[in-house]
Amino acid sequence: LLFLNHEFGKVAVMARGAKKTRNRFRSVSQPFVHGIFLYYKGRGMSTLNQGDVLHSFPDIRQHIVRMSYAAYMAELLEKTVEEREKNPYLFELFLTLLEQMEFGHDPEVLTSIFETKMTLQAGIQPELTKCVCCGQTDQIVSFSVKEAGFLCKRCTDQDPYAIHLHPKTSHLLRLFLHIDVQR
């Protein structure tokens, strides 16, 4: 199993027999379980000794679309967070977005918020207030991955691979970067 821990970051543990139907670890080894885990850290992989479910997010697991978006967010975490790297912000962000998703909020919007906030955690902060080339704040028409930010109408030719944006999209990207997910 791989779980994200508030205190120790990403932790890989072995849960012996978790796939068996009558095993005590069956319920805590399901996807997206928020719980309390007790594990033994040996020389190799840690071993799960005990686990209690706090919340299992059944509404996410029962809807394929929600499950897909939640799995995508979990995979982003798995790929970007180093083993045993403490990051309480990402733990709280992921948990909060799972809760919001279970309450019925749009999983696509929640995932976009997660992706935007993950760029900051990865050390990449795109320029979302003005054109990265000339500094103009009006007529933002595209986003350049190469330049890591918005391009105005005049500078959009600087990057032939720039992604053209609807005016509302640039506003949403700014909002996603700064929004408090608790709201």
Regions found by a protein language model. Give the residues of each.
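Non-catalytic alpha-helical scaffolds and adjoining flexible linkers that form interface surfaces
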Residues: 1-183
